[in-house]
Amino acid sequence: MISEVDMDDNFLGLRARDEFYSGKHIHRASQLILLDPENRILLQKRSPGKFWFPNRYTYSVSGTVADESYEACIAREMLEEIGISVPFRRLFKIPCIRENKGAYHTIFSGRCSEEAASLIRHDLEEATSIEWVELEELHRAVKAEPGNYTPALREGIIKIFKEGCEKYLF
């Protein structure tokens, strides 16, 4: 079950995941920007079997919010999707909503040590691959080839660079 919200992100109730595929409901999602000691971001390439944005690159960890807070969701998804847990902080919320469908994406950031990075194992049902990418390189890529990235990742990276990386990531 996934949390349904209104246009102002007020909780309405829980719905089955497949009901959101109709495009008639708004849900919540949590996203993690995971940085390594070299300030590279871990990206995952979404599995071709994913309903939303298959085969596109997205955040290090991405999950829909069930009957839980945004924070509880990202903590749970981190362990499920990459097999590690790191301290994180909330950065901002992005409304990716068009015609009363879509999601509120709350973006978090965390940093892992070299040792923790070596322990990362991605969930093959969620992602076909993961890779570490320089932030500047990602910023250029989301502008040059937007179709390769999820809308929430594009909007988040553009916001971070527009407002200053230091404000959010360091």
Swiss-Prot record:
UniProt pathway: Isoprenoid biosynthesis
Gene3D superfamilies, A to Z: Nucleoside Triphosphate Pyrophosphohydrolase
Keyword Metal-binding (UniProt): yes
Reactions the enzyme catalyzes: dimethylallyl diphosphate + H2O = dimethylallyl phosphate + phosphate + H(+); isopentenyl diphosphate + H2O = isopentenyl phosphate + phosphate + H(+); (2E,6E)-farnesyl diphosphate + H2O = (2E,6E)-farnesyl phosphate + phosphate + H(+); (2E)-geranyl diphosphate + H2O = (2E)-geranyl phosphate + phosphate + H(+)
GO MF term set: hydrolase activity; metal ion binding
A UniProt-annotated Pfam family: NUDIX
Role summary: Hydrolyzes homoallylic isopentenyl diphosphate (IPP), its allylic isomer dimethylallyl diphosphate (DMAPP) and short-chain prenyl diphosphates geranyl diphosphate (GPP) and farnesyl diphosphate (FPP) to their corresponding monophosphate forms with high activity. The preferred substrate is IPP. ADP, NADPH, Ap5A and thiamine diphosphate (TPP) are weakly hydrolyzed. No hydrolysis with ATP, dNTPs, 8-OH-dGTP, NAD+, FAD or acetyl-CoA.
Family stated for the protein in its record: Belongs to the Nudix hydrolase family.
Official protein name in the record: Prenyl-diphosphate phosphatase
Taxonomic source organism: Methanosarcina mazei (strain ATCC BAA-159 / DSM 3647 / Goe1 / Go1 / JCM 11833 / OCM 88)
